[in-house]
UniProtKB/Swiss-Prot annotation:
NCBIfam families: PRK00696.1 (NF001913), sucCoAbeta (TIGR01016). It comes from Methanocaldococcus jannaschii (strain ATCC 43067 / DSM 2661 / JAL-1 / JCM 10045 / NBRC 100440) (Methanococcus jannaschii). One of its GO terms (biological process) is succinyl-CoA metabolic process. Succinyl-CoA synthetase functions in the citric acid cycle (TCA), coupling the hydrolysis of succinyl-CoA to the synthesis of either ATP or GTP and thus represents the only step of substrate-level phosphorylation in the TCA. The beta subunit provides nucleotide specificity of the enzyme and binds the substrate succinate, while the binding sites for coenzyme A and phosphate are found in the alpha subunit. The lineage of its organism: Archaea, Methanobacteriati, Methanobacteriota, Methanomada group, Methanococci. The keyword Ribonucleoprotein does not apply. One of its GO terms (molecular function) is ATP binding. It catalyses: succinate + ATP + CoA = succinyl-CoA + ADP + phosphate; GTP + succinate + CoA = succinyl-CoA + GDP + phosphate. It is an enzyme of class 6 (ligase). The keyword Transmembrane does not apply. The gene is sucC. Its EC number is 6.2.1.5. This is Succinate--CoA ligase [ADP-forming] subunit beta.
Length: 364
């Protein structure tokens, strides 16, 4: 579960990580009643990356500018997401920008701290151009993470002595958040040093493990409250080809096919075993909510999932969205009946998933 920036920063504050002074503005608020008498940053609260480049961060120096910029944000979409809330922060006098994150390294099966003196830019870009500016440290979860480890990381990055204690303290507290809240990712980019020598988390990214919800009170978070109770596993991604399968392995293999054909999956959607026509309809409608989707790759190996039920669901949704590009690969239980249903409605199908993927990409 992804948290909005303002939610993540509220948690940072509770753990003693400095954040800029701020207030939250909602679409329903009366902007004229808000007094702004200094330079501020208006940050659209949307759960997408690259918000700044997409026009989701604006600046204002007085009330008139603030109202104008806030209205501009509320009336636009940032990478397909409507802006319902804006975090308004004091504009910091930034001297330096650093990067710090903690993620799960699935190869090493350990949490990984990543620190760089190159903040404010994509860490992938730094890794490609200046890999020597990235410090990595794998955490042994069987041992306590002590403050001296955070200091070692910062010293390895060759920070000035007057910054070591402050930055190390942020890293130490960041891992405390990561561990205590069952996070899968926590990131500050940039972690800034101001001209008066103070340190602030100028941005905040925090992803929590949905499977740990029973241990925490997630009800306070916006995405959890709004989360649909879907009868299938769904993860939205950055591509433009929706991938639907039955079974995690088959769905992942289908995503690999799309990647190998030069496109990126727009989602992972596993309808599971025994899905009926209604579940298939829900799945298709869900992926079509994503405005980036240009085509849908459906890969079904029927066991307890019946191909005729899948076909019925596809036909119903295609009536609602006749211009959507589909590719269907179906094999297994009631395969012949399912194929007949698709044929009657002019929907092509394949028995080879590679061929189905290739034909879909050719249409896009």
């Amino acid at each position: 579960m992804k948290l909005h920036e303002y939610e993540a920063k509220n948690i940072f504050k509770k753990y003693g990580i400095p954040v800029p002074e701020s207030f939250l503005v909602s679409k329903e608020d009366d902007l004229n009643s808000i007094n702004v008498d200094k330079e501020v940053v208006l940050k659209a609260q949307v759960l997408v990356g690259g918000r700044g480049k997409a026009g989701g961060i604006l600046f204002a120096s007085n009330k008139e500018e603030f109202i104008k910029k806030a209205e501009e944000l509320f009336n636009k979409e940032v990478k397909g997401e409507k802006v319902e809330k804006i975090l308004v922060e004091e504009k910091l006098p930034i001297e330096k920008e650093y990067y710090v994150s903690i993620i799960i390294d699935r190869d090493a099966k350990k949490p990984l701290i990543i620190f760089s003196t190159e903040g404010g830019v994509d860490i992938e870009e730094v890794a490609e151009k200046n890999p020597e500016k990235i410090i990595k440290y794998h955490i042994d979860v069987r041992k306590p993470f002590l403050p001296y480890i955070a200091r070692w990381i910062v010293k390895e990055a060759k920070l000035p002595s007057n910054e070591i204690g402050k930055v190390a303290d942020v890293i130490y507290k960041l891992y405390k958040i990561f561990k205590e809240l069952d996070a899968t990712m926590v990131e500050i980019n940039p972690l800034v040093i101001t001209k008066d020598g103070n340190v602030y988390a100028a941005d905040a990214v925090l992803h929590l493990d949905d499977d740990a919800a029973f241990r925490h009170n997630y009800e306070e978070f916006e995405e959890y409250k709004n989360k649909e109770k879907l009868p299938f596993a769904y993860v939205e991604l950055d591509g433009d080809v929706a991938v639907i399968g039955n079974g995690a392995g088959l769905t992942l293999a289908s995503m690999d096919i799309i990647n190998n054909l030069g496109r990126k999956p727009a989602c992972f959607l596993d309808i599971g075993g025994g899905a009926d026509a209604e579940t298939v309809k829900l799945a298709l409608r869900k992926v079509l909510e994503n405005k980036n989707v240009k085509g849908i790759f459906i890969n079904i190996l029927g066991g307890i999932t019946r191909c005729d039920e899948v076909a019925k669901g596809i036909v119903e949704v295609l009536k609602e969205h006749p211009n959507v590009k589909f590719a269907v690969r179906m094999m297994g239980t009631n395969e012949e009946i399912g194929r007949k249903i698709l044929e009657e409605h002019g929907i092509p199908y394949e028995t080879s998933m590679e061929e189905a993927g290739r034909k879909l990409i050719e249409q896009l």
